[in-house]
Structure formats: structure tokens, C-alpha cells
Amino acid sequence: MTTSMDFYSNKTFQQSDPFGGELMEALLPFIKSPSNDSSAFAFSLPAPISYGSDLHSFSHHLSPKPVSMKQTGTSAAKPTKLYRGVRQRHWGKWVAEIRLPRNRTRLWLGTFDTAEEAALAYDKAAYKLRGDFARLNFPDLRHNDEYQPLQSSVDAKLEAICQNLAETTQKQVRSTKKSSSRKRSSTVAVKLPEEDYSSAGSSPLLTESYGSGGSSSPLSELTFGDTEEEIQPPWNENALEKYPSYEIDWDSILQCSSLVN
């Protein structure tokens, strides 16, 4: 009975599923009773494939994960420190340049791997051009040996520029001294005639009058008339002809009064 049922089940299973015969042959030793034939048959059937769920899980693993804005802000690189006279090329190198004090043109100092090396090169050139008045990136390292030597061509250009600056400053100092000396000489020449007149003690008109031997000054002759001329009184031209003097003669006045009486 059991053998016939097994044969029937195998035959029907092979008709329904031609590829499951080998699986059933492997499971036959574990079948002990006819009651569990149906359960074994149900167990042997393959489960239907769920393509939708597998596709959803696969796409979930491949999809990009969302990243919050706070995480991007914290993970962003910090900006590098900016130095005077230093700028960065687009390929990552650092360039040092300096402006000349006269014509305000830029002098190229070199290309460096780090910004600190370029800043030190700028400090060396600035200190050579402006001395203690230079604005440096590292003022504490001014008198130390941290400054690396510049290129020979750049150093030669700096020496020539410093020499030209020294010559121009000397010329300006000389021109200012000459202009100040000319001003002083002109002021002394203007003051000399006044000193001559003051040392003489009198004006030229007075000295000429004294040298001619005259007893009176020409100013007195111009302002006063001749005192020797007779002045006729307007009320009586013939009354006092005998007395040309301006003094009063009381005797003549008394005689005239007695004659009138």
C-alpha cells in the first residue's frame, strides 16, 4: 500500500514538477508514515519567488544615503591663513611678491611649497627694502636665522633697487640743502642796505647838507620863509617903518600916544 502511494506521489510530482524528482528521492528515507506524506509533499514544493521584494531591497542598498548639512559643515576643511605678499596658484604652489616703494610695481620673489616659506621670503625682501619700517608677517623672526636665502637673481635685483633708492634720497637731500642756502643768501642781501643806512645814523639828504657846509638843513629852508624880509602890518603900512623888529618898543608907543593927546 505504501509503495503504491509512493509511486503515485512520485509520478504525480514528476508530472507537476519535472525538476523536483531528485529532491523527492533525497527526501524519501525521511518519510515514515502515510500521514505525513501530505506534509512532506508540501514541504518539498518550492516557494514562489518574490521579485518585487528582492528588487526593492537591492535598490535600497544601492541608493545614496542622505547626508545632513551640519555634517558637511563640520567636515569642511578650515581655510588656510593668509599672509602679506603671498598668494596661491591653482595647482597648489605658493608665490611670494612684493611691491616696490617708488613705482609700485610687483617684484616676483619665487614659488614655494608652503605658505610659510613664501611669507618668510616676503619678510626678507621687505626688511631689505624698508628696514625697521617694514610690515612683516613674522616680526619676531626679524633678527633670527629663520629666513632662507632668496634666489641669486632675485637677490641681485633687490640689491640694485636698494642702491638706486639710496642715490635718489641723497640727491633729494642735496637739492633741499641748495634751495635752503639760496633762500638764506637772498634774505641776507635784502637786509644789507638797511644796515648801511642805520650805521650811518642819518639819511643821505642830511649827509649832503652837512658836507656842503650850510648851517641850516634843507628841510628848514623849505618850511620856513626868509626872516630878514620886512612884514607890513595890514592896518597901517607907514606907522612902524622904523622898527623892522618884532619886539615891542614901549617908548615909541608912549610918544605916539602923547602926540595924539
Swiss-Prot record:
DNA-binding annotation, residue ranges on this chain: 82-139
Biased composition, class Basic residues, residue ranges: 174-185
GO biological process terms, semicolon-separated: ethylene-activated signaling pathway; response to cold; response to fungus; response to osmotic stress; response to water deprivation
CDD domains: AP2 (cd00018)
Keywords: Activator, DNA-binding, Ethylene signaling pathway, Nucleus, Transcription, Transcription regulation
Gene3D superfamilies the UniProt entry points to: AP2/ERF domain
Main location: nucleus
Origin superkingdom: Eukaryota
Keyword set includes DNA-binding: yes
Bias kind Low complexity: ranges: 205-223
Renumbered residue ranges of the record's region Disordered: 169-238
GO molecular function term, any single one: DNA-binding transcription factor activity
Locations listed in the record: Nucleus
Pfam families: AP2
GO cellular component, one term: nucleus
PROSITE patterns: AP2_ERF (PS51032)
Biological role stated in the UniProt entry: Probably acts as a transcriptional activator. Binds to the GCC-box pathogenesis-related promoter element. May be involved in the regulation of gene expression by stress factors and by components of stress signal transduction pathways.
Self-association and partners: Interacts with BTB/POZ-MATH proteins BPM1 and BPM3.
Similarity-based family: Belongs to the AP2/ERF transcription factor family. ERF subfamily.
Name the record gives this protein: Ethylene-responsive transcription factor RAP2-13
Organism: Arabidopsis thaliana
Lineage per the UniProt record: Eukaryota, Viridiplantae, Streptophyta, Embryophyta, Tracheophyta
Gene: RAP2-13
